[in-house]
């Protein structure tokens, strides 16, 4: 268990890497500082993956949450990062197709509802036209401005 302000628990399945606590302003600032560092290297776009909570366990302790739900905290973190880099860097948030369509345990809501401007969706296989249209409409209805679909056999 990590006890710093940034990470509160370790992910045994990922070699003991610490998770950053989405409720920690310092953790969100740290991610933003990493994006700023990449921007300073000349990159104009960055893809952020795993902006989520770990799978639930009894050992998790997020510290003070002020009653803010996990989904609302992720929305606030995404909004803070987008605001910080508005007009200077394009941020993409990457989620699986399943996370976009269902309430996953790591998000509590479908990813399309988290308020990102740019969404990269990864699918295990190509989507049929109806499924793609449904995803596009769902994302647009939630304010997603740009949607990119990456599947095993196509990148659109």
For the regions a protein language model found, what residue spans apply to each?
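Short, small-residue-biased leader/transition segments that mark boundaries at the very start
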Residues: 1-3
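Conserved alpha/beta catalytic core and glycan-binding cleft of carbohydrate-active enzymes
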Residues: 124-156
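Substrate-binding cleft/loops of secretory-pathway carbohydrate-active enzymes
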Residues: 93-125
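Aromatic-lined carbohydrate-recognition surfaces of secreted/lumenal glycan-active proteins
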Residues: 47-49, 70-106, 143-153
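The substrate-binding groove and active-site-proximal loops of carbohydrate-active enzymes
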Residues: 15-29, 65-69
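Active-site-proximal loop/short-helix segments
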Residues: 44-72
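Generic structural signal for well-ordered alpha-helices
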Residues: 35-36, 74-82, 132-137
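Conserved, mostly hydrophobic/aromatic
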Residues: 31, 38
